Amino acid sequence: MQNLFLSLLAAAVTVHAYGSGGSNWDQAYSRAKDALQKLSQTEKVGLVTGVKWMGGPCVGNTYKPESIDYPSLCLQDSPLGIRFANPVTAFPAGINAGATWDTQLLYARGAAMGAEAKGLGVHVQLGPVAGPLGKNPNGGRNWEGFSVDPYLSGVAMEKTIRGMQDSGVQACAKHWLGNEQEHYRDTISSNIGDRAAHELYVWPFMDAVKADVASVMCSYNKVNGTWACESDAINNKLMKEELGFPGYIMSDWNAQHSTVNSAVSGLDMTMPGSDFSNPPGSIFWGSNLEAAVADGSVPQSRLDDMVTRILAAWYLVGQDKGYPPVAFSSWNGGKANVDVTADHGTVARAVARDSIVLLKNDQRTLPLRKPKSLAIVGLDAIVNPAGPNACSDRGCNNGTLAMGWGSGTAEFPYLVGPLDAIQKRAAADGTKIVPSTTDDPTAGASAAAAAETAIVFINSDSGEGYITVEGNLGDRNNLDPWHNGNELVKAVAAASKNVIVVVHSVGPIILETILAQPSVKAIVWAGLPGQESGNALVDVIYGDTAPSGKLPYTIAKQAADYGASWINAETDDFTEGLYIDYRHFDAKGIAPRYEFGYGLSYTTFKYSGLWVNVYTSAGAANGKVVPGGPADLFEVVGQVSVFVRNNGRVAGAEVAQLYIGLPDSAPATPPKQLRGFQKMMLQPGQMGRATFELTRRDLSYWDVQQQKWVVPSGTFKVYVGSSSRDIREEGSFRVRRGW
């Protein structure tokens, strides 16, 4: 049996109360403790217990106490916009935000979502997502998160959370921990090794806690045999003690399984408070928790700690000062009495545009230069004829794909389809459009034969397991394009000498059949671009902006190359260990089709002048625990820089990427791991300098014996380049043992 945390055996119940650490939480805790003294026992229980499913205007609601000026909390999905409300902005999915590799856009997206949440009176927005991380390329909810790489995911978590909470809404980092597939998610045990847990799955949550995230959501699954929402190991010992998390842990909806065990194991809030349609007999807390405290099964100090954490988070983001009332109801169509969208469509378009990854561009097929005629082929080119919101929680694939399905969705205020946007540009250019807006290969070939260039739209969808779409129970059954996309492309390619393929997808698909067609000259990965889908695509394929997205995962030549997939069983032993995605491909010497971090531009970039300066010694991080972990773990201990020059004739943005290889003294470690990136916009001929700061954590591995982060001694390798495989500059530095 794998043991997740080797030093976590403890018989006594311990309350991991937050202690002063000089962070943003100190004043919030002081005020929360004052408010706690005014609450009755019943009011305390009401703050930690959801009212029930559909018991208030939001998907989650708490009881309002009378003794203090504190509301019924409104908790609402989703990670890409406000679910069950309108009008709101339907932003690009997390996976697209990650594909921008742009910290400013990540923050702007978070800030815009937070502003809309606050404007609607939402106190807690249920996002962003760090789990699933995406170890299984066909995992149903991978698209809600940012990347399969923990470093990129962690940076995205931090920037998004800061944006959301700066706007006044509490963010909720989810799903904690090991929620990597939809099949059996309510019963599966994710058995994760100690080191893999820390270096992969916990890593982005560390960044969330460091960013002062208000709340964390525990997941449906078990972790090493214990339900995540009643695991002392991951909630008390890891999240609250090791990571120093001052906020509160809430359950996913109906993920609680006990009264006492969940309380003493670190759960602070239960949602929705009852088992959906079966109240009140299914409630675990409420009066049952009050009785458990009365008979001593749950210490009074534990209940007080729950309440203090929840109140402190409310004070932390300033929700005690003129916060708007809830302006919608989730249960009557969500029509809000205010319009909170402002100019957020501009942000949505920028994220969608800058997340587009150009995978192939032979003979400079793109950008388009006022072609005489264009065939637009595929159902994915148009908005669902029944409307973009026709299917509940987007649980269908009947038009252009702009988000996956499930609770991680929002209502489209509008959806700009690719065909509509292209037609608008074509009219200005005098280009004739020949449409074939079905997935019928014969019709597609006929349209392609009548045009100078053909653009074929294909997609691949997934989502949450409570909805099955075309036989896919959340997780994808395979990595093929849906609706016989390969056959559609083959037919069009046989009829046209100049074919562009646009992919809207939740994750990687196998492209070998498409790449085997000689007339396929360009492939564009557009992901899940949200409401501005068509406009963002036109911005790129017509050259208004050079593509600058980079893959947030690896695209393989065949599905088996990933070495991981969702399993049809109730136990997942995470046998991949540290070796997922590019770490696996690198270690096994497998050539990907398109590697992690890959993405073409309309220009080229030259790297030069690598400079490395690292000033640290080997040893363990032993600093005082602050939000995120030991304080010295986040100390800057070195810099790496490189010059990047735009050698082309058009402006473009390049993402310079830093990878570090640990010395041989670090046991069984992937050859290289992402430890920095910087996106730079450069004019033709312009040179810029990318600078990466290295922290102790960036140079450390998790030592399972010491139960600490350790910087190993020896020679570290430095790789800087345009992707995980396109390395332009290499160097090294040596770290000696400390004295």
Swiss-Prot record:
Enzyme Commission (EC) number: 3.2.1.21
Signal peptide extent: 1-17
Annotated family: Belongs to the glycosyl hydrolase 3 family.
Location relative to the cell: Secreted
Function comment: Beta-glucosidases are one of a number of cellulolytic enzymes involved in the degradation of cellulosic biomass. Catalyzes the last step releasing glucose from the inhibitory cellobiose.
Catalytic activity from the UniProt record: Hydrolysis of terminal, non-reducing beta-D-glucosyl residues with release of beta-D-glucose
Residues glycosylated per entry: N224, N398
Pathway noted in the entry: Glycan metabolism; cellulose degradation
Organism taxonomic ancestry: Eukaryota, Fungi, Dikarya, Ascomycota, Pezizomycotina
Protein name: Probable beta-glucosidase L
Species this chain originates from: Neosartorya fischeri (strain ATCC 1020 / DSM 3700 / CBS 544.65 / FGSC A1164 / JCM 1740 / NRRL 181 / WB 181) (Aspergillus fischerianus)
GO biological process, one term: cellulose catabolic process
